[in-house]
Every structure is written in C-alpha cells, then in structure tokens.
C-alpha cells in the first residue's frame, strides 16, 4: 500500500502512486479509442457538440494564429480551428495517448483536414514547445486525467504567447441539487452499462465517471489557473454546471 501523500494521486476513487497513473490512464484510452466518438454521442446525447461549439466561440481564434488542441483526442476542435486559422495559421493536435492520436489523424485526413495541422504526442505536464508559442490553447475533457494538474497548467501558461488565452472545457459540479443526484445515478449506473454494451469495456467508463467526481469544482479550478499565472480567469457553467468552460489569459 502506498501511503506517502506526496507520491500518490487519484485514479478515479483509487489512490495510486503518481508514477502509475499515466500508464493506467493510457490503458483506459487505448481501450476506448476505437469507440470514443460513438460513446461521446451516446453518453452526452450529442450535447458535447454544443459544449465544444461554445468553446470555439469563446476562443477568439483568428486567421493566421497558432493553436494547441491539447488532449485533442479525435480532433473535433482541431477540425474547426483548422478552418479558422486558414493557410497562414497552424493547429497542433497533441495527445499523450498514441491510440487516440492515431484515431484523430485518420479521422481528420478522411474529412480533408490537412496542410495546417500537426500531430504531436505530448505530456501536458512537460509540453515540448518553446516559450510563447501559441495564441490559444484548449484542453477539452482532458485535464481531469492529468496526474499533476498544477504542473500541467504551468506548462500551458509557459507556451502561451503574451495576450494568449487558455480554455479548459471539463466536466464539473452541477449547480442544481436534484440534477446532481440524477447525474450521479446516470454516471455510476447507466454509463458503465453503455460502455459494456457498446465498447465492451464497462470498467473504463466506470473510471471516467469516478474521475469526473474527483475533478476540482469550478472555483477550485479557477484558483488553480490563477496560481499558474493566468489572469482575468472566468468560467461559464454549461448544462447547469454538468460541464464548465474556464478561460484565462497570459499578459
């Protein structure tokens, strides 16, 4: 049993060694990669598309800019940003998981998104980019899977250009109590069953439900972003706080 709190972290409801978590999360996403898009639609009843659209609308991305879609998975945001930045801009789709990165690359190439998109396997805690590289960074439903969130936020801050913005789209804490109870029931009882039926992997979706519950609430994440150096941090509750979009700037 690991009992040194400085060397442990959460994997869902489990307490594990920090050195173990990345491999455990990797196993989850290797397992779910092939069914990731289908499961997103089923789990959220398609509403994830609206959450991502709102994120894009809040990004302020313009033609010619450089964007990092971190933990970008199958590339939903990258596809939109690619059109927004145009031929003179650049989008980097980065993910720590090579299975997810492969799915994203294949999906985007199949729909004709080529030319201004690069693919990088990267750990959010140690981004392999120079200081002041990106006009905008988004991380969509990825931060809760990171072992050291504070370190990752500092890494994102470092590679943002002055005037750049970071947007974190993530599951959060419902602000309506009856909804919170219903959401818990759905997450812990229905979601794993859907995962078992569709992806033949109920355990991975049980972890995903648990990881949502262990993720910091809206105000805690706001404070974490401020501690990383971001300014003018604000958040927007979506679907009554089931999801929140946090936005902060580097000045």
From Swiss-Prot:
EC numbers, comma separated: 2.1.1.163, 2.1.1.201
GO annotation (BP), single: aerobic respiration
Molecular functions (GO terms): 2-methoxy-6-polyprenyl-1,4-benzoquinol methyltransferase activity; demethylmenaquinone methyltransferase activity
Keywords: Menaquinone biosynthesis, Methyltransferase, S-adenosyl-L-methionine, Transferase, Ubiquinone biosynthesis
Residue positions binding S-adenosyl-L-methionine: 74, 95, 123-124, 140
Involved pathway(s): Quinol/quinone metabolism; menaquinone biosynthesis; menaquinol from 1,4-dihydroxy-2-naphthoate: step 2/2; Cofactor biosynthesis; ubiquinone biosynthesis
Listed Gene3D superfamilies: Vaccinia Virus protein VP39
UniProt xrefs under InterPro entries: SAM-dependent_MTases_sf, UbiE/COQ5_MeTrFase, UbiE/COQ5_MeTrFase_CS
Catalytic activity of the protein: a 2-demethylmenaquinol + S-adenosyl-L-methionine = a menaquinol + S-adenosyl-L-homocysteine + H(+); a 2-methoxy-6-(all-trans-polyprenyl)benzene-1,4-diol + S-adenosyl-L-methionine = a 5-methoxy-2-methyl-3-(all-trans-polyprenyl)benzene-1,4-diol + S-adenosyl-L-homocysteine + H(+)
PANTHER family the record matches: 2-METHOXY-6-POLYPRENYL-1,4-BENZOQUINOL METHYLASE, MITOCHONDRIAL, METHYLTRANSFERASE
Function: Methyltransferase required for the conversion of demethylmenaquinol (DMKH2) to menaquinol (MKH2) and the conversion of 2-polyprenyl-6-methoxy-1,4-benzoquinol (DDMQH2) to 2-polyprenyl-3-methyl-6-methoxy-1,4-benzoquinol (DMQH2).
Stated family: Belongs to the class I-like SAM-binding methyltransferase superfamily. MenG/UbiE family.
Protein name as it appears in the record: Ubiquinone/menaquinone biosynthesis C-methyltransferase UbiE
Organism annotation: Enterobacter sp. (strain 638)
Name of the coding gene: ubiE
């Amino acid at each position: 049993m690991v009992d040194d709190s400085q060397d442990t972290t959460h994997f869902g409801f489990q307490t594990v060694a920090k050195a173990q978590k990345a491999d455990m999360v990797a196993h989850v996403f290797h397992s779910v990669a092939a069914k990731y898009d289908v499961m997103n639609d089923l789990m959220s009843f398609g509403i994830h598309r609206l959450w991502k659209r709102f994120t894009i609308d809040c990004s302020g991305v313009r033609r010619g800019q450089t964007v990092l879609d971190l933990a970008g998975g199958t590339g939903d945001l990258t596809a939109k940003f690619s059109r927004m930045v145009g031929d003179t801009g650049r989008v980097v789709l980065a993910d720590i998981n090579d299975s997810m990165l492969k799915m994203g690359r294949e999906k985007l190439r199949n729909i004709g998104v080529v030319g201004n998109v690069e693919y990088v396997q990267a750990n959010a805690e140690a981004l392999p980019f120079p200081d002041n590289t990106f006009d905008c960074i988004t991380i969509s439903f990825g931060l809760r899977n990171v072992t050291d969130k504070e370190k990752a936020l500092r890494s994102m801050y470092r590679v943002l250009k002055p005037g750049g913005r970071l947007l974190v789209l993530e599951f959060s804490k419902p602000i309506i109590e009856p909804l919170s109870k219903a959401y818990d029931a759905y997450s812990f009882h229905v979601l794993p069953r859907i995962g078992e039926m569709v992806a033949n992997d109920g355990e991975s979706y049980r972890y995903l439900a648990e990881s949502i519950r262990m993720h910091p609430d809206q105000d805690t994440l706001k404070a974490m972003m401020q501690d990383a150096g971001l300014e003018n941090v604000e958040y927007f509750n979506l679907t009554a706080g089931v999801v929140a979009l946090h936005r902060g700037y580097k000045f």
